[in-house]
């Protein structure tokens, strides 16, 4: 998806484009939480199926339909778009082909594999994804620990952080594009998320305070996620873009497995989610450090690997 967007949007508009597309994630959390809760409670036993089975059927079928629609309607690149005039195609391709003020970009996949900056970005993305997925998976449990036991009520409460995240994502992407800055717009929200997650255990027993802290932390992590992807898209260009972005994405997305799993291990070992929240905070803080220290220019990397 990131590579596809990089073929349509130049570096100057990339953060906002990413925000508009990936805001679907938090919106899915807003709609999906209450909808899933309603499906599981209302359709349990209908047709001999459990509530969770109906949930997978009802929520999975639209994905299949949208997949078919995308296949037949989206063009691979501006030159293939039937809805653009020749002049519009030329303008879009000129913007995408521009370097956005970055004189040195990685243009070959072999250079991607040799460049330490790519691996630093991969690890930073891992550290961003780790708490995002952990929060998504464990949020209902965290709220249950504060006394929320009704399934439908739990679904509505779990949607609140994603409303904030959707708004924060768009605001972060818009401002990052407006000022032309990426690193701090990704790193500082990650640092804020780390601080919020670290103090959340101290609010245990207070539902409103816990939900407020988790909401703010979720919004900050999604802000960091949104602007992060504008960094590699400005660095990796040409034939290397697909492979380079895929490499960062593949390494980083493994955090989506380790995040929820690690919180489960910590809870099993300690009997509490507090340690898991602190682990999420550490990962968010590490992502901040990795992004801020990723200052070495691609030109320097080229000179070193030449």
Where are these regions (language model features)?
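Glycine-rich segments within core transmembrane alpha-helices of 12-TM secondary carriers
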Residues: 15-40, 62-63, 249-259
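Cytoplasmic helix-loop-helix junction between adjacent transmembrane helices
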Residues: 1-23
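Intracellular juxtamembrane helix-capping segments at the cytosolic ends
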Residues: 1-9, 223-237
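Interfacial helix-cap and linker-helix signal at transmembrane-aqueous boundaries
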Residues: 35-47, 143-144, 175-177, 262-271
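Extracytoplasmic gate region of multi-pass secondary transporters
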Residues: 112-173, 225, 229, 259
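A late C-terminal transmembrane helix in Major Facilitator Superfamily
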Residues: 29, 235-272
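C-terminal transmembrane helical hairpin of 12-TM major facilitator-type secondary transporters
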Residues: 181-231
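Symmetry-related core transmembrane helices of the 12-TM Major Facilitator Superfamily/SLC fold
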Residues: 53-72, 277-292
């Amino acid at each position: 998806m990131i590579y596809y967007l990089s073929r349509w949007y130049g570096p100057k508009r990339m953060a906002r484009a990413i925000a508009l597309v990936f805001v679907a994630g938090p919106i899915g959390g807003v709609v999906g939480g209450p909808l899933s809760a309603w499906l599981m409670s209302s359709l349990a036993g209908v047709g001999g199926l459990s509530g969770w089975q109906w949930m997978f059927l009802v929520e999975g079928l639209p994905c299949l339909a949208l997949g078919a629609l995308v296949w037949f309607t989206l063009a691979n690149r501006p030159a293939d778009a039937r809805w653009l005039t020749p002049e519009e195609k030329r303008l879009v391709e000129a913007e995408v082909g521009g370097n956005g003020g970055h004189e040195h970009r990685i243009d070959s996949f072999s250079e991607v594999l040799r460049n330490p900056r790519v691996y630093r970005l991969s690890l930073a993305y891992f550290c961003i994804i780790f708490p995002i997925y952990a929060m998504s998976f464990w949020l209902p449990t965290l709220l249950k620990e504060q006394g929320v036991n009704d399934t439908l009520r739990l679904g509505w409460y779990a949607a609140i952080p994603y409303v904030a995240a959707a708004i924060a994502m768009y605001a972060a992407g818009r401002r990052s594009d407006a000022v032309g800055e990426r690193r701090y717009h990704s790193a500082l929200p990650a640092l804020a998320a780390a601080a919020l997650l670290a103090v959340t255990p101290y609010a245990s027993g207070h539902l409103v305070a816990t939900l407020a802290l988790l909401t703010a932390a979720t919004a900050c992590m999604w802000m960091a996620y949104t602007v992060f992807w504008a960094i590699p898209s400005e660095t990796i260009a040409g034939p290397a873009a697909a492979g380079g972005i895929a490499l960062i994405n593949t390494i980083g997305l493994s955090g989506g497995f380790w995040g929820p799993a690690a919180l489960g291990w910590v809870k099993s070992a300690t009997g509490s989610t507090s340690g898991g929240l602190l682990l999420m905070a550490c990962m968010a803080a590490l992502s901040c450090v990795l992004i801020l220290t990723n200052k070495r220019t691609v030109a320097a990397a080229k000179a070193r690997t030449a």
